[in-house]
Structures are given as C-alpha cells and as structure tokens.
Amino acid sequence: MADHMNTTQIEVGPGATNDTINFGAGILECYERLSWQRALDYPGQDRLNRLKRKLESRIKTHNKSEPEGTRMSLEERKAIGVKMMKVLLFMNPSAGIEGFEPYCMKNSSNSNCPNYNWTDYPPTPGRCLDDIEEEPEDVDDPTEIVLRDMNNKDARQKIKEEVNTQKEGKFRLTIKRDIRNVLSLRVLVNGTFLKHPNGYKTLSTLHRLNAYDQSGRLVAKLVATDDLTVEDEEDGHRILNSLFERLNEGHSKPIRAAETAVGVLSQFGQEHRLSPEEGDN
C-alpha cells in the first residue's frame, strides 16, 4: 500500500481489512471532533474511548502482517477514513482516494442506493445537538410509579414490586419523586430486559433516559449509541451513576429521585449498595 499523505491522492487498495480499519479511524476522528465541541454525551464518550482502544489494537496486529514501508499509524488512517466518508456521503469520486469506489457508484440501479445528493439537505440553521428534545418512545401499558414523601428504603421496595410485574421485552418507566425540601425530579426511562428461566431479570439494553425538573424543563438526557443501545449492562449502570452525579452538583442535598432511578435499574443486575447516609433513610 502506497503512502502519499502529503498529496490529495491516497491509495487505499483492494483489501477490505484496510478499508474497514481506515473507515473506523475516520469515525474516531468524527467522534473526537464532537468531543472537542462538547457535543458528546456519556455513552458517546465511552464509545469514543472503546473505539480508540480497539483500533489501536487492531492496527498493531494488522501492521505485523504488512511490509514495514507500508505500515500506517492511527493518525494517518484517520486522514484516509475522513476522505472515504466524503466519497460515501457525497458520492464524489474526486474526494481524494484512489482504489475506493462506492458500490452505489458502480451499481446505481440498485434500489438500496440513494438517488439524491446529501448536499441538497443542509443542516437547519440555529439548531444543534442540545436543541433536540425527544421523549422516550411509547410502549404498551407503561409503568408509572409515583413516590411522594416516601423514604428511600420504602421507595425502592415499591419500585422493585412494581417493576417485577413487567414482562420480558421493552419497558417505559416513569418515576415521579416529590419530597419536602428536595428538588423534585421526573425521570423517564426506556429499556429492555430479559427474564431468565429461574425468574431472575437482567437489564439487557438501555435505550434512553430523560430527566425533568419540577417545571418540566429537560435537565439531563441520555441517548445510548448503537441504535440506542448501551453495549453492556455494566456500562449502563456506570453511565447512569455518572449522569446523576452531575445532577447532584450544586445542591445542598442529593436529588433523591436520582438515587431512586439508579436503584430501579440496579434491580436488573448488580446489587445496589446503600451509602452510609442512605442506610438510615
């Protein structure tokens, strides 16, 4: 594979492995630029870090099978990957890559190929990622739990009883928490859980989470990656805890609804351990 990083023409070559690695590096570059703009949420940051580790490992392994003169670093592959995106998105063969031609350019009659130019659809002026406010999707017979003036121990027990009546599959859970002298918070959660033969349930995916203050204003949201799916259960718990820690900042007392919401999801996996402060409540 020729290395001409100082020109506009870069040979990608016919190998699908190189194409895949280079394109992944381009995706990583996009994630990093989003991160610089502070436009990535917690699962996005996790995805960035995991993708970088996987690419570094795969490049190291792949380079062992390449002649020394053709080995490329992650940064070099990022440049190629970004140009590959230009070819794919804008169907522009002059984007600067030789040896890489999109399938749709060679098979324009294929019904799965787009027949429009993406440049015809510029982004809407004045809108950015933070402006997007979507409610978690509706599901049949959603669970709604109202917890008013209830201590955390009783609240968790009520939640556990309510949630355990749910069937396998997707669920929507609304938690309304209102305690004297504590900021009220409404938490909407979408997720999917699996029921095992022994009756034990585990959270398999977390699709999205919105948190609203007492005036109905969206104060935090979590949209998971990969078709709205957190990749594993541990990630989901860690992301939620981090999210709610941010909500707690700046308040003299913890937001009990936040702790309650984390407790709900913890019923589908690892045991939720009470802090010393909570143990007496």
Curated annotation (Swiss-Prot):
One GO-annotated biological process of the protein: symbiont-mediated suppression of host ISG15-protein conjugation
Cite a single GO MF annotation: RNA binding
Classification via SUPFAM superfamilies: S15/NS1 RNA-binding domain
Instruction: For this UniProt record, give its keywords in alphabetical order, as a comma-separated list.
Output: Host cytoplasm, Host nucleus, Host-virus interaction, Inhibition of host innate immune response by virus, Inhibition of host interferon signaling pathway by virus, Inhibition of host ISG15 by virus, Inhibition of host PKR by virus, Interferon antiviral system evasion, RNA-binding, Viral immunoevasion
Chain segments carrying region RNA-binding and homodimerization: 1-93
Give the InterPro entries listed for this entry: NS1, uS15_NS1_RNA-bd_sf
Q: Provide the residue span(s) of the region labelled G1P2-binding.
A: 1-103
Q: Name one GO cellular component term.
A: host cell nucleus
Chain ranges for the short sequence motif Nuclear localization signal as given in the UniProt record: 50-55
Localization of this protein: Host cytoplasm; Host nucleus
Which residues are the signal sequence here? none
Note the Pfam families from the entry: Flu_B_NS1 (PF02942)
Q: What does the UniProt record say this protein does?
A: Binds and inhibits the conjugation of the ubiquitin-like G1P2/ISG15 protein to its target proteins. Since G1P2/ISG15 is an early antiviral protein, NS1 may inhibit the host antiviral response. Prevents EIF2AK2/PKR activation, either by binding double strand RNA or by interacting directly with EIF2AK2/PKR. Also binds poly(A) and U6 snRNA.
Quaternary assembly: Homodimer. Interacts with and inhibits human G1P2 conjugation by UBE1L.
Q: State the family named in the UniProt similarity comment for this chain.
A: Belongs to the influenza B viruses NS1 family.
Record's protein name: Non-structural protein 1
Q: Which organism is it from?
A: Influenza B virus (strain B/HT/1984)
Lineage, opening ranks: Viruses, Riboviria, Orthornavirae, Negarnaviricota, Polyploviricotina
